[in-house]
């Protein structure tokens, strides 16, 4: 354990308020807040919670859509030395109850519209003592805005932290079982913010502007920290649903320079006709992560937006800090060696990346193994789950569960999740390789391939395809004919289905577990 004192990450907000008190820090709809106003509100809420008995180490659960209170809640937690436990607001009451119980939450900051979630959390978590309602408060609850109003001008007592003091429980869904709380610490996150600024949005300052298109509870929240550190404002969408037309309007109006999202959202935004009606020349960095981006989608985005794409690869446990493919390493020209087709880039600054075999020895160049990393961005473990921690950190490396290989330059190529790979007739099949080929078909918009049990082959691939035009006549035979000569036959999906849409997670990732479950339901109903 590292007991050395470090800067409380909450100081980032204080520093921007001191440097740029009258500059805008947050915008949502027709409302905006200066850095000074945000700091005053955060100090007021932190003081109010201290008066309620909240102290260092307590856990603050946050269940809310993106709004100023959700944005502030992490800074309140950080400055108090508490642990921020954000949820995806789309979770059900039982799912939020599990997070409250497993994190031993002491406080819940929650929008009033999620009253059922509050009640479920209170029933499941005996540690939960205080409910702070965003919106109308019930008799047993405190109103967020009332607490802020009554405590404006008050200063919370300063909380000193050490390197290993936790500040965020980053829940990861994983491939099996219940979500696990990855412990992010003040020391680790100070490195992460510095690393992201250096590798993802270098040169960002108070004259830049960011827009959040995903819930602040995960990657979008981490990206918001970077902009706070540089005094750059963040725009929150005024609607729960992402509307491409509105997005491009906001980019033009506020001269947005950077954003973080996932490949499916990039695809949706650049394929919408609104992209051609608004000025997006201010964009410097469109950062994508969370899932592979198919080459066809990457090329289209580059053609529409110019050289602004930045890819990073990483998991919540290392807050994305494994590899980066900067914008100068992207190209829409397949013949350009700097296109780095299929690669997710080079190791992040200060991080070491390795591909290991099952015995933890290094895989040869070009040999597929498990992608592992080590460095200051690695988390402190899973809260209350020592077995999972030991498994994830065995041999002195963080094990991602992703498969890939390194080329002669040390650039990383991902083959897929260990859990995505299936074995058909004794051969390992990595769906991503086949998905890439199918996506080059002009009539295919989206595709996902999953392994399903088969009495003859052990497992076979099932491809689920979304057509660009639902009225287009496209058959499974057409897809197989397209694959012929482009990839080995043993990799071909055994079954092909056409769906109107692919199920996605709350963060826009294709949910392969849900696809498998739906396919199993089909099988059982036959």
Give the positions of each predicted feature.
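Conserved AMP-binding/adenylate-forming
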Residues: 5, 31, 46-94, 213, ...
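Conserved pre-ATP/AMP-binding loop-to-beta segment of ANL
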Residues: 22, 133, 139, 152-171, ...
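Conserved AMP-binding/adenylation subdomain of ANL enzymes
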Residues: 190-209, 217-257, 272
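Gly/Ser/Thr-rich phosphate-binding loop
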Residues: 256-261, 270-339, 352
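Conserved ATP/PPi-binding loop(s) of AMP-dependent carboxylate-activating enzymes
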Residues: 346-350, 359-391, 429
């Amino acid at each position: 354990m590292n007991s050395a004192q470090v800067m409380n990450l909450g100081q980032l907000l204080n520093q921007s308020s001191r440097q740029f008190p009258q500059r805008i820090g947050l915008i949502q709809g027709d409302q905006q807040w200066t850095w000074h106003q945000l700091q005053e509100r955060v100090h007021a809420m932190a003081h109010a919670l201290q008066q309620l008995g909240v102290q260092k180490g307590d856990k603050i659960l946050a269940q809310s859509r993106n709004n100023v209170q959700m944005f502030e809640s992490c800074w309140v937690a950080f400055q108090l030395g508490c642990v921020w436990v954000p949820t995806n607001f789309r979770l059900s009451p039982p799912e939020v109850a599990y997070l409250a119980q497993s994190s031993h939450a002491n406080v819940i900051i929650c929008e009033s519209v999620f009253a059922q979630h509050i009640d479920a959390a209170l029933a499941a978590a005996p540690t939960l003592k205080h409910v702070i309602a965003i919106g109308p408060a019930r008799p047993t609850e405190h109103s967020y805005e009332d607490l802020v109003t009554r405590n404006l001008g008050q200063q919370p007592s300063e909380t000193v932290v050490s390197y290993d003091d936790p500040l965020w429980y980053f829940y990861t869904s994983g491939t099996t079982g219940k979500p696990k709380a990855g412990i992010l610490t003040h020391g680790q996150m100070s490195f992460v913010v510095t690393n992201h600024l250096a590798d993802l949005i270098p040169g960002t300052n108070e004259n830049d502007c960011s827009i959040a298109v995903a819930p602040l509870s995960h990657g979008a929240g981490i990206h918001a920290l970077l902009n706070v550190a540089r005094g750059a404002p963040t725009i929150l969408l005024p609607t729960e649903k992402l509307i491409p037309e509105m997005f491009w309007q906001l980019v033009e109006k506020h001269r947005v320079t950077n954003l973080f999202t996932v490949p499916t959202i990039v695809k949706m935004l650049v394929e919408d006709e609104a992209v051609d009606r608004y000025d997006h020349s201010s964009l410097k960095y469109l950062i994508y992560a969370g899932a592979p981006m198919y080459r066809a989608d990457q090329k289209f985005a580059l053609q529409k937006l110019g050289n602004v794409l930045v890819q990073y690869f990483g998991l919540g446990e290392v807050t994305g800090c494994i590899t980066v493919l900067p914008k100068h390493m992207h190209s829409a020209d397949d013949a350009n060696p700097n296109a780095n087709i299929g690669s997710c880039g080079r190791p992040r600054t200060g991080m070491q990346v390795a591909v290991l075999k099952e015995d933890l020895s290094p895989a040869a160049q070009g040999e597929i193994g498990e992608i592992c990393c080590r460095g200051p961005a690695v988390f402190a473990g899973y809260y209350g789950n020592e077995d999972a921690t030991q498994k994830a950190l065995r041999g002195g490396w963080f094990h991602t569960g992703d498969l890939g290989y390194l080329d002669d330059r040390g650039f990383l190529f991902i083959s897929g999740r260990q859990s995505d790979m299936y074995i058909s007739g004794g051969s390992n099949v990595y769906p991503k390789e086949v998905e890439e080929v199918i996506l080059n078909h002009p009539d295919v918009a989206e595709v996902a391939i999953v392994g399903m049990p088969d009495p003859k082959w052990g497992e076979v691939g099932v491809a689920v395809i979304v057509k660009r035009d639902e009225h287009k006549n496209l058959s499974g035979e057409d897809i197989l004919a397209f694959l012929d000569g482009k990839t080995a036959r043993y990799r071909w999906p055994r079954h092909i289905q056409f769906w109107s849409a692919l199920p996605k997670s709350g963060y826009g990732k294709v949910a392969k577990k849900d696809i498998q479950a739906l396919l199993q339901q089909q099988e059982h109903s036959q």
